[in-house]
Amino acid sequence: MGIVFNYIDPVAFNLGPLSVRWYGIIIAVGILLGYFVAQRALVKAGLHKDTLVDIIFYSALFGFIAARIYFVIFQWPYYAENPGEIIKIWHGGIAIHGGLIGGFIAGVIVCKVKNLNPFQIGDIVAPSIILAQGIGRWGNFMNHEAHGGPVSRAFLEQLHLPNFIIENMYINSQYYHPTFLYESIWDVAGFIILVNIRKHLKLGETFFLYLTWYSIGRFFIEGLRTDSLMLTSNIRVAQLVSILLILISISLIVYRRIKYNPPLYSKVGALPWPTKKVK
């Protein structure tokens, strides 16, 4: 039962001394697909088709850097003794919450420079972000990482999973929870929900609901994982950040409705976001 017949090599192919990993390919596919999805919403909103190019470029770049910095900070005892490992990103070690923080800051700065409404842009890209995250989790599967605790093969079979997933969750003589799959399904479900309800939401609420939906799923799924970044022996960083994001997002939705009463996106089949700045 422990023999893996369909083991997936994390390396897709080699270009001379360079190994191209499935992880990087899948992340790139997620970003590109998210970009094309956002472009459709961008056109409906009446913005120029090139509006997102700089935003996505700088958000992806600084998000990636921040994701690495975030991981290193919470694993500092190891990296303090092995500083040369900090730049060796190919050895693994990025954190999605760090990426979200870095990408968010970069995106807001670009919006301000280009005189764009960050709430409007956030609403446009939110479904794309969670879709890209759902796709990106399959990169963890290819790397045989970010899995949950030990389970039996019988448990995995009861989930009616394809054999290639079951067999590749057999790592170091043990089967594990496919937490990558749980989160991928949760994220794709979030994408479907957001694209179907955003025209009924007010300015900024699609983005805040994205943060809320993602954080709820991440909180519970994180509890199953074995590789969590820990703040203390009992507190997982991702769970703490998820709680904070849920509270902040819901509070901002309520606050903005009371304080500003932003416009409602009510036109059926359209995304009538204003192109002027809205508080």
Swiss-Prot record:
Species in which this protein is naturally found: Staphylococcus aureus (strain bovine RF122 / ET3-1)
Coiled-coil region(s): none
Function: Catalyzes the transfer of the diacylglyceryl group from phosphatidylglycerol to the sulfhydryl group of the N-terminal cysteine of a prolipoprotein, the first step in the formation of mature lipoproteins.
One GO CC term on file: plasma membrane
Protein name listed in UniProt: Phosphatidylglycerol--prolipoprotein diacylglyceryl transferase
Family: Belongs to the Lgt family.
PANTHER family per record: PHOSPHATIDYLGLYCEROL--PROLIPOPROTEIN DIACYLGLYCERYL TRANSFERASE (PTHR30589:SF0), PROLIPOPROTEIN DIACYLGLYCERYL TRANSFERASE (PTHR30589)
Signal peptide: none
Keyword vocabulary terms for this entry: Cell membrane, Membrane, Transferase, Transmembrane, Transmembrane helix
Membrane topology type: Multi-pass membrane protein
GO biological process: lipoprotein biosynthetic process
The gene coding this protein: lgt
A Pfam family annotated for this UniProt entry: LGT
Transmembrane stretches, start-end: 18-38, 55-75, 89-109, 203-223, 235-255
Cellular localization per UniProt: Cell membrane
